[in-house]
């Protein structure tokens, strides 16, 4: 065999080893990036939001300790998702509230009352992780039974959350999170926060 053939094979074998080593490192780096990318380290840049509160339990279905635990959980998940995460509970009819907006939005059925309130609440407080009216989500859970016999909730999404969540995804989150809300409101709202974070970062 020609010495040149032997040298060539050694040359190829040498670089094949380094090529495979570099390829393996590149794959490991990509995996680490993917895992790290699931959580955000972005700082909140919205300076115009008029409140630091995220738990508005107007229906008084949570204890003070449960509210505080939710605030801690929400703060953690906000950093992970780079989204504001808000909870509002009510126990009142929204029929009169929604009627004010019918000239603008058209006739509203009772299941849409919560939509109007939730969207307005988000905008009025200028929620948004990156900017006012920016990235975030708000769950409005109204415990009141409207005239049609229904009890309604709404998931309001904005910015990146709106881009991420289709209507079917929002419905699925609400259905799963609020399945046992009557028996365990705190557990339901914890599930809302956790599910949103999972679905937002998966």
Model-assigned labels for residue ranges:
Residues 13-19, 32-202:
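Folded, non-transmembrane soluble domains that reside on the lumenal/extracytoplasmic side of membranes
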Residues 18, 22-26:
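Alpha-helical transmembrane spans of integral membrane proteins, capturing the lipid-embedded, hydrophobic core
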Residues 1-14:
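N-terminal Lys/Arg-rich, disordered targeting/topogenic segments
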